[in-house]
Amino acid sequence: LAFIFLAAFTVIIYYTSTKRGSNIGFTTSISLVITFMLGIFVGFGWRTEAIFLGVLISIILFSKERMHQLVSRLNQKEIGDLLEFLVLLGIIYPLLPSSFELFGVNVQPLMIWGIIVMISVLNFCVFMGARYLPIQHKVELFGFLGGLINTQAIIGSLMNVYKQNKKMFQNVASGFILINTAMYLRNFILITIIAPLTLLYVGIPLVLVLATLIPFSRLFLMMKHREAQIRIDSPFGVWAAAKLGLAILLVFIILDFSRSLGGNALLITAVLGGLVYSLAVCVSLGTLALNNVITAQQAALAFILANAASVISNFFVLYVTGGKDMISKVSKAMFISVVVSILGVFLSIIAFGLS
């Protein structure tokens, strides 16, 4: 309860100091939250976490000026969303049990929390990087970076650019291909960090996908290049974190249940899940593989199929947002990428063996 009051107090301090032009700003607000968390962690006996946070707060205070330069590209709402997001993570962490049973499935909330933090760090790096991009090839680069955060949302943004200027066809087509490239790369990074053994089976498919999509994207750019403004919205916020956590939990339970059914139920479920939210599917597959609930080979095959399903979903988004004439131009590249990824995972399973 005390932490909730402190969090509210911190947010109020930040907003009021921003309006008044006071020196109390982002780093001070973050430091207040983290310092209070140090006491909570020590009280719970989490001394390692307390030491880590102590070092972190020292770095934040030491690099205060650089931090101000970093967040200078963010508006007040975006910084407020980030603060609320950090506060939410801090409130939830001490309350989470290490594991519990739900519908006969062993759920590990702390692991899900850690995955959300990992994804958030990736999103933050991409989000900040996008603010410092040069103007050259901005549509294509924003397509790639946006694909790392929210695939379907950035497709909608690209199509808005296309609707405003039909001459941007080549740029938007290249951007769509790069969005899917980024999606493959993001999901690959997440599943291999969570379950490193899957690297043996998803590494070759990723290389084949990159070798297919990047040249096609470059080909569109060589035809004609134009510039346009596009913006990536903040990926932070209480609702975004809650939605991600609930999605991972739900998909994890469904995948674990489908595995118990035997046959191809796991693969079918991964495909259906990939049509909706491939990130949650890939994270859940990695978690199941890490806990030896499924093998690395099963996780890899389901991972590739989920990504293939997500490509289909992206085509649907492209269609409904007004990109009917673009589908025929980019379908060849995407079809080849799906085929080579599936061939790649089977070759990997043959090469590295079954278990």
Regions found by a protein language model. Give the residues of each.
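Cytoplasmic-side transmembrane-helix entry/capping segments in multi-pass membrane proteins
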Residues: 2-5, 20-33, 51-55, 74-84, ...
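Structural signature of hydrophobic alpha-helical transmembrane segments
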Residues: 1-7, 45-58, 107-118, 143-148, ...
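C-terminal transmembrane helix pair
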Residues: 185-189, 200, 294-355
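C-terminal ends of transmembrane helices
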Residues: 7-24, 61-74, 125-134, 155-165, ...
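Transmembrane helix-loop junctions at the membrane interface of multipass transporters and ion channels
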Residues: 38-45, 95-106, 177-200, 317-323
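Membrane-interfacial helix-loop connectors
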Residues: 145-150, 156-165, 169, 175-182, ...
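Alpha-helical transmembrane segments and their membrane-interface exit regions
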Residues: 5-14, 55-66, 118-122, 208-216, ...
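Selected transmembrane alpha-helices and immediately adjacent juxtamembrane segments
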Residues: 77, 82-139, 222-274, 343, ...
